[in-house]
Amino acid sequence: MFGKLLTKIFGSRNDRTLKTLGKIVTKINALEADFEKFSDEELKAKTAEFKQRLESGQTLDDVMPEAFAVVREASKRVFEMRHFDVQLLGGMVLDSNRIAEMRTGEGKTLTATLPAYLNALTGKGVHVITVNDYLARRDAENNRPLFEFLGMTVGVNIAGMGQAEKKMAYASDITYGTNNEFGFDYLRDNMAFSPNERVQRPLHYALIDEVDSILIDEARTPLIISGAAEDSSELYIKINTLIPHLIRQDKEDTEEEIGDGDYSIDEKAKQVHMTERGQEKVEVLLTERGMLAEGDSLYSAANISLLHHVNAALRAHTLFEKDVDYIVQDNEVIIVDEHTGRTMPGRRWSEGLHQAVEAKEGVHIQNENQTLASITFQNFFRQYEKLAGMTGTADTEAFEFQHIYGLDTVVIPTNRPMVRKDHADLVYLTAEEKYDAIIKDIIDCRDRGQPVLVGTVSIEQSELLHSMLKKAKIPHEVLNAKFHEREAEIVAQAGRSGAVTIATNMAGRGTDIVLGGNWNMEIDALENPTAEQKAKIKADWQVRHDEVVAAGGLHILGTERHESRRIDNQLRGRSGRQGDAGSSRFYLSMEDSLMRIFASERVSSMMKKLGMEKGEAIEHPWVSRAIENAQRKVEARNFDIRKQLLEFDDVANDQRQVVYAQRNELMDAESIQDTIVNIQADVVNGLIDQYIPPQSVEELWDIAGLETRLEQEYALRMPVQEWLDKEDDLHEETLRERIVEIWVKAYKAKEEMVGAQVLRQFEKAVMLQTLDGLWKEHLAAMDHLRQGIHLRGYAQKNPKQEYKRESFELFQQMLESLKHDVISILSKVQVQAQSDVEEMEERRRQEEAKVRRDYQHAEAEALVGAEEAQALAATQPVVREGEKVGRNDPCPCGSGRKYKQCHGKLS
């Protein structure tokens, strides 16, 4: 209450921000009359003047009012469009590392031209990031005339472009592209072998369109570049035949009784768990098929791979539904984005899940992949010096934007007042009653000439409605993952009188629905249209527009509430653009997944007690509140998963930054001879210390072991024992000096034989290739570590701390291996001439050609149990089974080493 009183007196934080920025808008407006008098040449010359002022020490804030006024004037001349004051506000918010929430139809694309131009003046490049290739190309082509008028270059960065094209795109002042492509290019640049293979400049300013979709919905999806691993398609096919034999458990296990069934499903967590009975049944089935030895357990260390395949197949059959989570097209399983309803060709689920789904559907099973490089969008975008974004719906996620990215959200007022009517939800008992009511509403709107946009949450729903409308003989268009080739055309005409459009998750479609239809697209369809033709098309459109407004504008009809309130708001936001008339209503049933999983049974029983007859609906604020609370629960849980994924990825990110920085340093260096000399000294001394411990007596020296290692790993034959037998004055230090001296001489001889330049090139190639190979193995080790780390909670340990500690140990081991492997290769390999180095490079290129890009879904299942396990760590007492192992006793693992030098190290 006190907070509300303060807000009344001082205004909200948002109001205060807008008030401050409003003063700058007044300054920009004051400049308009002066700039209108400028000739085109004088206006264009302002770009060079701004650049000069920045070089002489002024800041972007100093030139911003004039720069925005210049862009507004140029837009009036090039597009015949003037930036509204609210668009100037949006531009300022985007320039100040914040997120601008601008309603649909308020001109986000035009708003983006202001900060894009301003930040391009620095010469460091601006990346305007959209959700798909179509929007990137469209926005680049639409805005190119304006930017080129002002002397700026524009590039487009989309999938399938060659290296030279990408370099040119990144060298442009303003580069449009998709989030995937910018992320992949970053990873590819960090896998390059020479500086001229890199395409990106340092990451300066990113302006993200549909920022909530990219920074929140896709935050659980790391970008992964991977290479094919071994073929295990036969195994997936065999395991797939087991699943139909398993039965789902009807009720959960309790302390009193064990539920019947082989597996249980946790729909909230999207997890499936095998019961003890299920495990026994799977073991019997595997034994019958000769895949498991008689009496062997599925959970033994040797059968971990089998268990992994069984779990993947079980998830594929129980949690992933055709035409909801994926579609089958051209003998291929293609993922459907749950947030936008778009298909995502080229993306694959990780951890063998995609192959399991392919086996389930009987299509060609593609090989599993090995990760070569990966990064989450969260960590990629946090590398930009400046980051900003715009969307129609950000306020519900404002906390996450601030907490994860440090970005404040500012809600920009609409240019004209919003007049859309948002009706209360109608809740029915069954889905059948709900769909009947939806069809009646559609018919009613169509009879009045009101266009209807029906939003569904899955392809399955859209196809059900499609068949019902077909049966009712109602003409309509369907827009879903199966038919998005005609997307722009369908959306453009969705505002015509009586039009009925079914759309799966309308979010991110990128084309505004104009009441009466899109007259611009009609003009674009004509070749060289005359002024008369344009005038006629516009006049006809005006008549249609007025008819639709009189009928009530665009009516939004939601068939189900989405897990996220934001997606519902995006659907609603398609209506009522720029002060247009419009309305919206959601139809729900107690059989909807959100209601079934999260809304309490009390709602359902209350509806039954009310004695509701078939076809009756309940419309009550209490029910709407219950639904909103259910959505809040899901949003909070999803936020926790994203936050947890980020906490784990931050550990990997620190290591990634070190490796990539070191890699770029090596690649840019003319010669890495000094680095090789230092590594060589470390390796030699480490090796000698291992076999001749410092300040130790001769009896502890393992000379035979030292001679063997020197010969096997470093191709150096040294009769160390012979020297010691013959030379009495040879002690530890003089022996060390002699070994180092011979080693250095052998390497010098190699250099004299092939030439210093060839050896320097070879050193660099070996160093980079060895680093890449070890980094690849390290990523796989980190994946395995992360997948099982939550189990540490059951051993009273904090999974996050354990992950940090063990991943650091793995990283240290990788760096040690790098030193030894590089020196071993350089010592053993005989380089004959330049052709050997070139052959090595050619082999690398051939390997690289086999590498495919994968945009894999890592839904963080491995982390879901971490918090639960962590809680257990705090509450469960320590119970030791068996005798305590002494520090000097042999390790129980059977390695032959002392416990303190083996597994005792970790305890």
UniProtKB/Swiss-Prot annotation:
Cofactor(s) needed: Zn(2+)
Family note: Belongs to the SecA family.
One Gene Ontology CC term in the entry: cell envelope Sec protein transport complex
InterPro entries: Helicase_ATP-bd (IPR014001), Helicase_C-like (IPR001650), P-loop_NTPase (IPR027417), SEC_C_motif (IPR004027), SecA (IPR000185), SecA_CS (IPR020937), SecA_DEAD (IPR011115), SecA_motor_DEAD (IPR014018)
Membrane topology label: Peripheral membrane protein
GO molecular function: ATP binding; metal ion binding; protein-exporting ATPase activity
Enzyme Commission number, as recorded: 7.4.2.8
Annotated positions binding ATP: 87, 105-109, 512
Location in the cell: Cell inner membrane; Cytoplasm
UniProt remark on cofactor binding: May bind 1 zinc ion per subunit.
Name of the gene encoding the protein in the UniProt record: secA
HAMAP family cross-referenced by the UniProt entry: SecA (MF_01382)
Protein name: Protein translocase subunit SecA
Primary site of residence: membrane
Chemical reaction(s) catalysed: ATP + H2O + cellular proteinSide 1 = ADP + phosphate + cellular proteinSide 2
UniProt-annotated binding residues for Zn(2+): 891, 893, 902-903
Function: Part of the Sec protein translocase complex. Interacts with the SecYEG preprotein conducting channel. Has a central role in coupling the hydrolysis of ATP to the transfer of proteins into and across the cell membrane, serving both as a receptor for the preprotein-SecB complex and as an ATP-driven molecular motor driving the stepwise translocation of polypeptide chains across the membrane.
Isomerase recorded as keyword: no
One record GO biological process: intracellular protein transmembrane transport
